[in-house]
From Swiss-Prot:
Record-stated family: Belongs to the bacterial ribosomal protein bL33 family.
Lineage, uppermost ranks: Bacteria, Bacillati, Actinomycetota, Actinomycetes, Micrococcales
Gene Ontology BP term (one): translation
Gene name for this UniProt entry: rpmG
Segments passing through the bilayer: none
The protein's name in its UniProt record: Large ribosomal subunit protein bL33
PROSITE patterns: RIBOSOMAL_L33
Keyword annotations: Ribonucleoprotein, Ribosomal protein
Amino acid sequence: MAKDKDVRPIIKLKSTAGTGFTYVTRKNRRNNPDRITLKKYDPVVRKHVDFREER
């Protein structure tokens, strides 16, 4: 039913602070073909840190 190469795949964003905390989101593969990095809140260290896309 679902396409193998979906335009908006579900990705995990993992904290670069080393806490293991993750966010789950979707990204548009046409607009962002590379791995994305977002600055989001990590509740373990109670700070905003970079979250990188995990494959």
